[in-house]
From Swiss-Prot:
The chain crosses the membrane at residues 18-38. Keywords: Membrane, Photosynthesis, Photosystem II, Reaction center, Thylakoid, Transmembrane, Transmembrane helix. The lineage of its organism: Bacteria, Bacillati, Cyanobacteriota, Cyanophyceae, Synechococcales. This is Photosystem II reaction center protein L. GO terms for cellular component: photosystem II reaction center; plasma membrane-derived thylakoid membrane. Its main location: membrane. One of the components of the core complex of photosystem II (PSII). PSII is a light-driven water:plastoquinone oxidoreductase that uses light energy to abstract electrons from H(2)O, generating O(2) and a proton gradient subsequently used for ATP formation. It consists of a core antenna complex that captures photons, and an electron transfer chain that converts photonic excitation into a charge separation. This subunit is found at the monomer-monomer interface and is required for correct PSII assembly and/or dimerization. PSII is composed of 1 copy each of membrane proteins PsbA, PsbB, PsbC, PsbD, PsbE, PsbF, PsbH, PsbI, PsbJ, PsbK, PsbL, PsbM, PsbT, PsbX, PsbY, PsbZ, Psb30/Ycf12, peripheral proteins PsbO, CyanoQ (PsbQ), PsbU, PsbV and a large number of cofactors. It forms dimeric complexes. It holds the Pfam family PsbL. It comes from the Bacteria. One of its GO terms (biological process) is photosynthesis. It is found in: Cellular thylakoid membrane. InterPro entries: PSII_PsbL, PSII_PsbL_sf.
Length: 39
């Protein structure tokens, strides 16, 4: 991911994208774990 020729081009956009992906991953993992525990 460090092969971007312009690393300072969209730092805020990349940070927001990584943050949203992290929250989505945690949410999906929580749903899967809750389904396993409740079943």
């Amino acid at each position: 991911m460090q092969r971007n020729p312009n690393p300072n081009n969209l730092p805020v956009e990349l940070n927001r994208t990584s943050l949203y992906l992290g929250l989505l991953f945690v949410f999906v993992t929580g749903v899967l774990m809750s389904s396993y525990f409740f079943n």
